[in-house]
């Protein structure tokens, strides 16, 4: 089984980082095409936004490693502050995370 951590961007420029085993299904859930999870992004969809996948990271040995990477990506994004474009903030955090010797520990 493959594990993914993904980055979504909304039509309004918002971003979301999450983890899944099925990228296509998860994006459909975020866009409320099918039921299941995705509560945080569902509000935006109700306001007329749609989500697209900007990218993903794969190659995690197990689900806990993917969740650890997701958590670190989200938290590293915060160090760039709110003045930076949300997508730029997420991409800078991803760059920093991938530069670490052990990004999942």
Regions found by a protein language model. Name each.
Residues 5-10, 14-22, 26, 30, ...:
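GIY-YIG nuclease signature motif recognition
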Residues 23-67, 72-88:
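Conserved short loop/helix modules at catalytic or binding sites
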Residues 84-105:
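A cross-kingdom feature marking charged/low-complexity
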């Amino acid at each position: 089984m493959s594990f993914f951590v993904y980055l979504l961007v909304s039509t309004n420029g918002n971003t979301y980082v999450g983890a899944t085993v099925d990228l296509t299904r998860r994006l459909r859930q975020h866009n409320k095409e099918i039921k299941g999870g995705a509560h945080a992004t569902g509000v935006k969809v109700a306001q007329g936004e749609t989500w697209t996948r900007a990218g993903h990271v794969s190659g995690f040995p197990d689900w806990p490693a993917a969740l650890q990477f997701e958590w670190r990506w989200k938290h590293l994004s915060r160090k760039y502050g709110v003045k930076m474009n949300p997508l730029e903030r997420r991409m800078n955090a991803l760059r920093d995370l991938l530069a670490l010797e052990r990004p999942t520990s």
